[in-house]
Each structure stands twice: as C-alpha cells, then as structure tokens.
C-alpha cells in the first residue's frame, strides 16, 4: 500500500514539475510571482482619445506590498538570440505600428527592430506620470522597441485611495511611483535572467527599499503597474514581470485553505460559536440564574462586611465591583458576545493567528512560498530537483531521498495542522461554555473551576504557538539547505526536436506551454550543464536570502553586524549560484564548478531536521500544558523547595557559625565593610550598564512604545520629534570644524559634544585665537568665528543633540518611575495590567501619606506642648540655667539640633518640613492625575500655549497655578538638598551661623540658580525655540521688506500681507506655473507666521518660568540677609537678576519695522 502511495506521489510530482510554463528557471526562482503587463488598452479604458494626450488606467496586480524590499525584474527579450514573439516569451513593446490584436505580441514590423537608445544616455524621468512633464523620451534610433522595463512604472498606492478614480488620479496618483527601466548599474548591482534559449542575460528591474516611516505607512497597500505613453492606440507588445520579494503571497496553500475554512465556520461573522454562545446567553433560565447568583453574591458580601467576617480594603472592594460588572454584562444579550469576544476571546483566536503569521513570516528567509510545504512542492523546486537525474550518478539517490523526506515532512506538517485545528475546535467549545464558567469566579468554592477553565484556554492557545514555532525553526534550516543545494538555474531541453510541429499547429501549443513549440518530449537540465570555472561568472547582485553581513566593524562582536532581509543587500557572488557566499560556502561552490551538482550533506541535514521536528511535535502539547498549569502548582513547589533548603542549610551553617563566633569583632567588621563596598561597586557598575542600555534603547527601533507614551505624557517629548541621529550628527559637525582649525587636534570631540553651545564657542575661541573666551574677542574676530560656526550649522546641531539627550534622560526616568510603581516587564506592555498596577501604587502612596500625616499631627501636638513648657522655663530661670537643665525638664530633643541632619534643624523644624514634603507629594499626585486625564504634560509651555490658542483661558490659569506651585517646590528641593544646602535650620541661622557661612550660602544660592536653569527640562528648550524664532523672524523681515520695496509702502499690516504677496508674485512672474508659485509663497509665509507666533508664546512662557526661579531664589537670599541684619553683620546683598526678554507679538513687530 505504502509503495503504491509513493509511486503515485512520484508520478504526481513529475507531472507537477512540467506545469511551470517557463522554458528556463532562474537560479533564485523557487516560485516567483509572474504576470504580464500589456502596452495596449481597450478603447473604452482610454480617457482622452486625442493623439498625444491619452491617459490609461493603472493595472492592479492583485498583490499588496508587505514592507520588505520590493524587487521586480523585467524579463529580457531578444528576437535575434532566438526568443519568440509569443505571449509566453515576449517581454518588449513597440510604440509604433500596433494593431488591436497585438495585446501580447509585437506588430510584425516591430519584431526585428533594435532596442531603443537615448540621446542623453539615461532613462531618468522618462514619461513620468507627472502631467506637467510633456516631453517625449530622447530616443536616438526610432522606430525601435522598448526593453528592460523602459516606460514601465509601478505604483504603491496610498491606503484608501484609488488611482483609477479619475483622469487626474491616473496622471498623478497618490503613493510611491518608480520607473522600472532605470539602469541598475548606477546603484551598484545588476539583474540577470536566463533567456528562453538558455543564455544568461542582463535584465531590467528595480529594487525599491522604503525610507523611514514609509515601510509601515504603505504596508498592505495595493501594487499597480502601467506602461506610460501618450498615445496607446498604435502600441504593441507586453512586459513579463517577475516579483521576487516585497509582496504578500496570496496564492492558496492547501493546509492554510483548510484552516481558514474551519476557522470561518467556527468563528466567522455567522459562525457556530457565536450563534451558540448567544443562544445560551439569551435563554431565560440562564438569565434568571445569573441574576440570582449576582444577588446572592451582593447579599453575602454586605452581610460578611456587617458582621466583620471580611475586611473590605480599597483593593478588595475594587475587585468585587469588577467581578459584579463582568457578570452583569452577561445579562445584556446585545453586549455579551461583543464584550467578551473583543476583550478576552480575541486573544485566543485572532491573537494566536497573528502570532503564527509572524512566526511564518520570520521563517520565510528567502524566495518562494512562506509555507515550507509550498516551497518543497513548487514546480520550480521540483524542476531543479529532477534536473539532477542525468548530470550526476548520485542524482537518482538524491531524488529518492528528497521524496522520502518530503513524504515525512508532509505528514508531520499535516499532523501539526490537525493539532492546530483540534485546538481551535476545543477553544471554540470552551468559549461556548464561557457564560457558565465566568460566573464561577464569584465564589471561593467555585473559583477553581473558573481558573481551570481559563488555564485550559491558555493551554490550547499555546499549543499551536509552540508547535509552529518549532516547525518555523526547523523549516529555516531546511530552507537554507534547499536554497544551497538547488539554487541553480535550469532549462528544458527537447528530445527529439520536432521543429515542424509549430508550423502545423500554429501557436496553439505555445499558448499551452511555450516549450512545446519544438517538441512534446523534454527534460530539465542545469545551467550551466557542465562544470568548469569559465561557465561561472561573478558579479555584484542582490543577495536573495536573509543573511548577516560580517565585516571588519563587527568581527569581534557579531551582535553589531547588519542583518539583511532577502534582496536588501548587495554582494559579489556567482550569478549562477546566488545563494552561496564566496567565503563561507567555498566548498560547495567548488563542487558545483567541478560538475558535482548533488550535495548529499544537505539532504542529511534535512533528515536530521525531520527527526528533530518529529520529536518536537510529540513534546509541544505537554510543554504548553506544563506552562499553562505551572501557576496552579507553583506555591506548593516553592514550599517543598524552601523546606528542604532550610533543613540542609542549617546543617551546613553549623560549622560556619561556630567559626564566625571565634573571629574577633574588628575582623568581622572589616570583612562586612569590604563586602558592602564590593557589593556597592558591582551594584554601581550594573546600574551604569543598565542606564547605558536604556540610553541606547531609547534611540533604537526596539524602544518600548509604552515608555515612549509615558515620556510624551509626563515630559511632553514626542519620540516622533526626536532626531535619533542628532548626537552623532553633532559630533560629526564638531569633528569637521576641528579639522579646519590649526590646533583643532588639541580638542576632544566627545568632551566638546557634552558642552552647551556657548561653552563650545568659548573653547573654539580659546583654541583659534588664544584668548580666554568669546567675550574677549575683537569685533572682527567675533564676526569671523560667528560665520565659521554658522557655516558648520553647529548651533542647530547642538540644539537637536541637547533635545535628544533630554529625551534619553526622560526615557530613563520614565522607565525607572514605571518600575518603581511596580510596573514590570509585562506590565509595561499590557494596558489593563499597567492601569491596575498604577492604581495599586496610587492607593499605597495615599495610604502611606495618610499614616505619615497622622503620626505627624501627634508629634506636632507634643512638640507644641514641650515648646510651651520650654518658654515657661526660660521666663522663670533664664536662658543659661534652662540650657543647663533642659535635658531633664523639657524634652530638649524636640528643640535641640539634629546633628545627623545636613541642615542641622531641630526636630520640630524637621516636622514642619516633612509636612511640606507631604503637601508636595500630594501636589505631584494631583498633577499626575490631571496629566493622565488629558494624556499630555500639563506643565509644559507648549501645552499651555496650545490651550491659549484654543481659547481655554480658565484651564491655562489653573494649570499655570499648578506649575507655579510645583516649580517652587522643585526650587526649594534643589536649594535645601543634602551636601551644600543654601539655608540651615531656623534656630541654627539665628544662633549659630557665622558671617562666612552666610556669605557661602548666598554664593551657593547663585551657583544652584545656574544649575536650576540648566537642568530644568523646560528652560533647556529655550535654545530650540530661539532657533525657530530667529529663522521665522528673519524670513518674515525679508518677505516684509520685499513687499515694502515692491509697493513702495511703509504702513503694511499683517492682514494685508497675503494679498500683497500674491499680487507681487503676479507682477514679477509669468507663465503657467504662477498659481503654483503663489501657493508656495503663501504657504511659506503662513508657516513662518505660525512658527513665529508659536515660538514667541513658548519662549515667553519659558521666560516666566525663569523669572519664577529667580524670584524664589532671591527670597531665600533676602531671608539670609535678614538673619545677617538681626545678627548686626555687614550687608551682603547679592540678588540674582534674570536677563530675560519679553518678545513682541508679530503685529507689534511689523509696526516696529515700519
């Protein structure tokens, strides 16, 4: 029986290999998408019938791009070399002499014409879809035929757009348009293809790689093609296209078709699962039962609370309300399915499908079907396989082994598919039972039933994921071997040659299969058929499979090596063996060159992979069950482990404890101190390593999106506004500048890049002119240096780099803050869990503040009582005698100095400051709550300006008041921080502070003021908005002066400017593009106005913030001077002056220019 099945399989595969329709198959072709694009259209498709002004629709390829490099090759065609003028071989078109029947063939006159050449020796911008380009192509040898993709364009249409909706959209569609006829040699590679006669020829095509956000923006967008001409009625011919990568393959996979069919029956819009679920929920008996259960649960909860049987904490209350809300939804027949499907069941249905799709895409490391089975049985793969039969005596053995391997792989994948379908059906059955088991979560006695139900759902969802993850891993190994062993070209060779058959039957056989034009008997043979180094040619080509580029920059650290997707990177390889690296695969290359096409080591690795796959299939289910069931037994396992560990550790520690007791105290102290120091050293190293990792992560594509949203919400920095390469650009700019300085090599780029722009300017001044700083330069030197720095664009680069560094710091702080609130690795990526942990953290903080306040009130009352006792004793016995006996009479610890306190406050003073700290924490929590509500940084100048623009004056005043209070608290924290506080405790300042100490405090206040301005995340943005302001101001002044000079007027208002600009353009320009010029000028003017007004408003807000910092610091300086005055010391008045400015509105600025 098995032998009959094997024979049938062999015959089927032999027949399948003859269905390719191609005379030759390229080395990297394992099932490419191929279709034709005709140069002719039906008359009703043409929009304009006037000669020289026809517009044709774009041809829909029926495929969508997937974001990977889009690689399209145009087949070569040459009639002189033997290619035929048939629909199966023709890949050229002619703009002359065509008839209606020349849709897929050339007109007889055009067959023997030469390919077109061009006067400018280039094909750039030829016949672009831009309606403004009405120039003909610069053809030097008309009439001729177009080949290699000349005149053919592809279009990646923007989502939700139709390029054929109107003639204008056909001329100028929305999306990405590229010409396939450009010379690929200009970008460093060539396309090669095997012609129908077996010759390796250069081909046309394009390799388009997306820029920046275009990859995600255009993913799953439709792909169109069109040969662009101005008159289509006399065209003839077509292009044959081969899409090598970059599109989602929609060709049906048998097993995938079966899976989708069953999934649609079960979970479709009118699927069995949904109908059955709704029938259960709509049953009156079920609704009555759920209502009764909810009533009982609420009654038991209230009764248990009244008799003190349960302690309803905030968390417990929220949990119970959450349960009641969930169960109540089951009573709503309209919302029951929608709610539970969208928020729970979708993870087990669509979530699993999405994960499997990601796994399959990751496993598809090269051309051909994403499915391993589809790759192995593709006609191209089988054709290459059977070509081995007559070139090597081992070919027959290899074919038999391959078919045996294919037999096992088919049944293993079929088994995996059955497991997946079984899991899907089981998940569906458990979802049907969901309305029953969800109710079981209410009571402790039934909660285990709900948990087991949920655990089983997770188990059956994990089974296909784990199973197909293993299959994907093994398939990557098998794919690599298939590409390496069968990655060569093949062609059909006829025997015997029946040339006259084509003359007898015409083109009938050619329409069925082009290769039947000469003979109905043929076989596949490799290209080249024989070995020899002369038959193999090296060239720069696109590497057709995923690989890692190992160069000198990453030899020692492969993690830094670049990973290239299929057809993304260029490398020098043999054209006939594009999958083999010249260095790593030199052994196999030598085998091919020596005529040994059969690689038995590859088939051996495939069998090893099959064996691993069979073992993995058997363990995948048990692995999923173990993962899903671990949580239920984790506590017991931990208890057993802990008990066994304690009994063993006690026996081990006995002699150690005895020895430790005999060691003297100084020795143990030194050991403890050394251990602590070592721990601190490693902890510091680890923390620094983690911080550096977070800094790199913040600027990489792997940055955590949730942390980025937290940065945007709390710090007002959107990752989209950050130039991820700004720091490197700034360093490169400094490096270029230093190369132009005579003594530039004395300065270090890294050190300079950490400085502010003004500090950098001082360093450059000192290096170039041997002066102290920029202020000591002469006027000529300043002018020269300013021009040098402006040409280097260092100010803008420094501003961008500082903004990027601020983003890195905010990312680190946001990550640490989220971790500090109990939000771990999983919580950062799961919205519900993150909100729950945030809520729990907020409750804990409020509870802690409440407890601290209660203790503080008690201590404050007692401190007041002891203060009254102390004042009474001072009145009776005097200050000196009081100080002598204070320790025994008045609880002096409340009013004496805390010598462990850096500010030497009394305990009573410390209590007052602690109360202020609690107020600050409450304010911080309130601001965080407001920030969460609006999902924006409410304290940022940018947000306040946006509110003012929107006319929300009351909100602006409210948020400004919060910002003012928060800023005052922040300034106080900076001034009174440990180390060098600006002011000590009140009693110390009155009784102990010396003249020099107070002078140092005032000087320290000035130093901390500078630090406050430098580190404040909002004032640091001043340089960024200064640049925007100055650029907009310069542009507006120039525009105003041009309009002023043109109309000879001085009293021009801002309202008149748009009309005057438009009139000025009309007066000074002529031609068809005048409307476009007017629009461009007005857009530039409006953009400058917008930038000026926005930057002015933000800068004024920043100045207000700086003034607040100045005022708060000056208040502290005044207090110190007051203490000095009371102590009869000399005045040391040294207030801080904020040299800020208030910027004028645009209207006032225009008036000032008149």
Curated annotation (Swiss-Prot):
Note the InterPro entries from the entry.
Answer: Conjugal_tfr_TrbL/VirB6 (IPR007688)
Kindly list the cysteine pairs connected by disulfide bridges.
none
Q: Name one GO biological process term.
A: protein secretion by the type IV secretion system
In this UniProt entry, which residues carry a covalently attached lipid of the kind S-diacylglycerol cysteine?
19
The way it spans or sits in the membrane comes to: Multi-pass membrane protein; Lipid-anchor
Record's superkingdom?
A: Bacteria
- This protein is called what? Uncharacterized lipoprotein RT0028
Task: Specify the species.
Answer: Rickettsia typhi (strain ATCC VR-144 / Wilmington)
Q: What is the lineage of its organism?
A: Bacteria, Pseudomonadati, Pseudomonadota, Alphaproteobacteria, Rickettsiales
């Amino acid at each position: 029986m098995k032998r009959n099945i094997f024979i049938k399989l062999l015959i089927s595969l032999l027949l399948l290999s003859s269905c390719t329709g191609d005379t030759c198959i390229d080395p990297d072709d394992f099932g490419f998408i191929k279709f034709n694009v005709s140069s002719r259209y039906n008359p009703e498709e043409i929009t304009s019938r006037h000669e020289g002004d026809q517009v044709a629709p774009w041809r829909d390829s029926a495929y969508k791009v997937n974001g990977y490099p889009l690689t399209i090759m145009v087949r070569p065609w040459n009639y002189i070399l033997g290619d035929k003028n048939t629909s199966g071989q023709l890949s050229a078109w002619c703009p002359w002499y065509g008839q209606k029947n020349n849709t897929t063939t050339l007109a007889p006159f055009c067959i023997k014409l030469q390919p077109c050449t061009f006067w400018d020796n280039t094909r750039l911008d030829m016949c672009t879809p831009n309606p403004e380009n009405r120039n003909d192509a610069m053809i030097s040898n008309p009439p001729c035929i177009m080949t290699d993709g000349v005149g053919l364009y592809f279009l990646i249409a923007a989502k939700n757009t139709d390029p054929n909706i109107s003639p204008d959209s056909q001329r100028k569609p929305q999306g990405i348009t590229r010409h396939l006829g450009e010379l690929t040699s200009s970008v460093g590679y060539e396309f090669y293809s095997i012609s129908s006669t077996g010759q390796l020829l250069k081909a046309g095509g394009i390799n388009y790689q997306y820029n920046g956000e275009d990859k995600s923006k255009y993913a799953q967008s439709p792909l169109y093609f069109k040969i662009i001409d101005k008159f289509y009625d006399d065209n003839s011919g077509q292009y044959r296209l081969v899409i090598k990568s970059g599109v989602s393959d929609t060709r049906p996979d048998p097993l995938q078709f079966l899976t989708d069919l069953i999934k649609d029956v079960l979970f479709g819009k009118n699927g069995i699962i949904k109908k059955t679920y709704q029938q259960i929920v709509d049953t009156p008996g079920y609704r009555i039962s759920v209502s009764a259960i909810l009533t009982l649960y609420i009654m038991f909860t209230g009764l248990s609370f009244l008799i003190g049987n349960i302690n309803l904490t905030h968390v417990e209350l929220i949990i119970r309300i959450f349960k009641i809300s969930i169960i109540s939804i089951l009573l709503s027949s309209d919302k029951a399915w929608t709610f539970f499907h969208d928020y729970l069941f979708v993870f087990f249905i669509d979530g699993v499908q999405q994960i499997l799709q990601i796994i399959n895409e990751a496993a598809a490391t090269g051309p051909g079907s994403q499915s391993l089975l589809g790759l192995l049985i593709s006609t191209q793969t089988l054709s290459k396989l059977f070509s081995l039969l007559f070139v090597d005596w081992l070919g027959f053995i290899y074919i038999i082994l391959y078919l045996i391997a294919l037999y096992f792989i088919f049944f293993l994948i079929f088994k995996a598919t059955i497991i997946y379908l079984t899991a899907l059906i089981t998940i569906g059955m458990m979802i049907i039972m969901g309305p029953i088991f969800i109710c079981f979560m209410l009571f402790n006695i039934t909660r285990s039933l709900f948990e087991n139900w949920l655990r089983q759902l997770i188990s059956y969802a994990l089974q296909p994921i784990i199973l197909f993850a293993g299959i994907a891993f093994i398939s990557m190994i098998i794919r690599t071997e298939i590409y390496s062993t069968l990655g060569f070209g093949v062609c059909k060779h006829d025997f015997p040659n029946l040339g006259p058959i084509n003359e007898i039957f015409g083109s009938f056989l050619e329409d069925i299969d082009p290769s039947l034009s000469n003979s109905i008997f043929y076989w596949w043979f490799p290209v080249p058929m024989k070995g020899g180094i002369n038959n193999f040619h090296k060239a720069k080509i696109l590497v057709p499979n995923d690989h890692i580029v190992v160069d000198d920059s990453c030899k020692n650290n492969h993690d830094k090596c670049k990973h290239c997707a299929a057809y993304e990177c260029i490398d020098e390889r043999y054209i006939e063996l594009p999958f083999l690296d010249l260095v790593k695969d030199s052994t196999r290359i030598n085998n091919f060159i020596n005529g040994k096409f059969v690689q038995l080591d590859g088939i051996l690795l495939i069998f090893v992979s099959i064996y691993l796959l069979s073992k993995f299939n058997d363990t995948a289910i048990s692995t999923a069950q173990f993962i899903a069931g671990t949580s239920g037994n984790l506590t017991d396992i931990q208890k057993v482990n802990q008990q066994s560990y304690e009994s063993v550790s006690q026996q081990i520690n006995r002699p150690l404890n005895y020895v430790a007791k005999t060691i003297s105290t100084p020795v143990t102290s030194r050991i403890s101190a050394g251990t602590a120091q070592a721990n601190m050293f490693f902890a510091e190293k680890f923390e620094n390593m983690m911080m550096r990792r977070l800094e790199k992560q913040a600027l990489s594509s792997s940055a955590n999106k949730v942390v980025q949203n937290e940065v945007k919400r709390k710090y007002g920095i959107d990752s989209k506004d950050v130039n991820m390469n700004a720091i490197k650009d700034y360093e490169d700019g400094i490096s270029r500048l230093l190369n132009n300085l005579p003594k530039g090599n004395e300065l270090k780029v890294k050190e300079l890049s950490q400085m502010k722009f003004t500090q950098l300017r001082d360093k450059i001044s000192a290096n170039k002119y041997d002066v102290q700083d920029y202020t000591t330069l002469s006027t000529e030197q300043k002018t020269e240096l300013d021009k040098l720095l402006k040409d280097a664009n260092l100010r803008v680069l420094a501003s961008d780099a500082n903004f990027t560094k601020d983003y890195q710091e905010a990312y680190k702080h946001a990550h640490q803050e989220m971790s500090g609130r109990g939000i771990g690795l999983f919580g950062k990526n799961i919205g519900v869990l993150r909100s729950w942990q945030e809520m729990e953290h907020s409750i804990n903080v409020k509870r802690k503040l409440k407890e601290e306040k209660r203790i503080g009130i008690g201590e404050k009352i007692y401190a007041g009582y002891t203060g009254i006792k102390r004042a009474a004793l001072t009145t009776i016995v005097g200050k000196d005698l009081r100080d002598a006996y204070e320790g025994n009479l008045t609880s002096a610890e409340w009013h004496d100095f805390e010598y462990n306190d850096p500010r030497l406050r009394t305990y009573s003073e410390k209590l007052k400051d602690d109360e202020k700290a609690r107020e600050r924490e409450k304010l911080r929590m309130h601001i965080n709550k407001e920030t969460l509500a609006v999902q924006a940084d409410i304290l940022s100048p940018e947000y306040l300006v946006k509110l003012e623009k929107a006319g929300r004056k009351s909100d602006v005043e409210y948020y400004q008041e919060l910002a003012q209070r928060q800023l005052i608290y922040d300034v106080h924290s900076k001034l009174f921080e440990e180390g060098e506080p600006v002011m000590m405790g009140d009693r110390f300042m009155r009784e102990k502070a010396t003249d020099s100490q107070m002078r140092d405090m005032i000087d320290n206040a000035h130093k901390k003021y500078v630090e406050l301005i430098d580190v404040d995340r909002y004032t640091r943005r001043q340089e960024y908005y200064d640049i925007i302001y100055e650029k907009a101001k310069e542009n507006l002044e120039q525009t105003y002066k041009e309009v002023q000079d043109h109309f000879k007027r001085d009293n021009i208002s801002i309202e008149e400017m748009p009309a005057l600009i438009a009139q000025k353009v009309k007066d000074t320009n002529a031609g068809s593009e005048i409307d476009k010029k007017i629009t461009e000028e007005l857009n530039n003017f409006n953009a400058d106005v917008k930038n000026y007004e926005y930057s002015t408003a933000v800068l004024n807000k920043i100045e207000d913030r700086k003034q607040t910092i100045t005022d708060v610091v000056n208040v502290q300086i005044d207090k110190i001077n007051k203490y000095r005055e009371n102590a009869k010391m000399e005045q040391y008045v040294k207030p801080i002056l904020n040299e800020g400015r208030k910027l004028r509105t645009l209207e006032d600025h225009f008036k000032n220019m008149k």
